[in-house]
Curated annotation (Swiss-Prot):
This is Probable thiopurine S-methyltransferase. It catalyses: S-adenosyl-L-methionine + a thiopurine = S-adenosyl-L-homocysteine + a thiopurine S-methylether. SUPFAM superfamilies: S-adenosyl-L-methionine-dependent methyltransferases. It is an enzyme of class 2 (transferase). InterPro entries: SAM-dependent_MTases_sf, Thiopur_S-MeTfrase_Se/Te_detox, Thiopurine_S-MeTrfase, TPMT.
Length: 213
């Protein structure tokens, strides 16, 4: 899967994964994690997610990472904010910043340890399921190396992949444990049947919520 795939989806406004309010699992479980206010939360492949506004509203610093410049700009447009624009130290990312939220526009795999040195929490709602198997391996290894022991949430989707091509891709519980369990401690918090999500395709996906601790 090449970057152009996602750029094209954003350019054509084919962004069915975008939610119009904060994710209910985030709202339900994040306050139970007891993550200190003022902590920095990384949101990989963040798009223009309103989850970032919700996290900032609770007193967190948010570091979103997003490939699409259009998505980065639209996030602040919907907030009616004019972001400050700068570059990171390596020059590989354009940083859009307003309030306590930064969105780094660039390739997630170009992040280095210095870029995320203040990050202590992670929120992944639609990141790992956006990626095909080979990229999921890279994603988990990359974040595991950069962020040794984060708190946070990972939300995944699982279904019969033979019935539909992703994204969103099916990621089983066993794969989540294999990908992330090497570097991080995971606890399954909830499984939810999402029977209406892909009803026309005859698929009955399961959504899983994991705690990082």
């Amino acid at each position: 899967m090449k970057p152009e795939f996602w750029q094209d989806r954003w350019n054509k406004d084919q962004i069915g994964w975008h939610q119009k309010s904060a994710n209910p699992h985030l709202v339900k479980y994040w306050p139970t994690l007891n993550i200190s206010q003022g902590s920095t939360v990384i949101v990989p492949l963040c798009g223009k997610s309103l989850d970032m506004r919700w996290l900032e509203g609770l007193g967190y610093n948010v570091l979103g990472v997003e490939l699409s410049e259009k998505a980065c700009k639209q996030y602040f447009d919907q907030m009616e904010l004019e972001p400050k624009v700068s570059k990171n130290a390596s020059g590989k990312f354009t940083i859009y910043e307003a309030g306590n939220t930064q969105i780094w526009c660039g390739d997630l795999f170009d992040l280095d340890a210095d870029d995320v040195k203040y990050v202590s929490a992670l929120y992944d709602r639609a990141s790992v399921i956006a990626l095909p198997p080979d990229m999921r391996e890279r994603y988990a290894a990359h974040l595991g190396a950069l962020i040794p022991d984060p708190q946070g949430l990972i939300i995944t989707l699982d279904y019969d992949q033979s019935k539909m091509n992703g994204p969103p891709h099916a990621v089983s519980d066993a794969e989540v444990q294999r990908l992330f369990g090497t570097n991080w401690k995971l606890t399954l918090l909830e499984e939810v049947d999402k029977k209406d999500m892909f009803k026309e395709e005859g698929i009955e996906p399961v959504e899983r919520v994991y705690k990082l601790n």
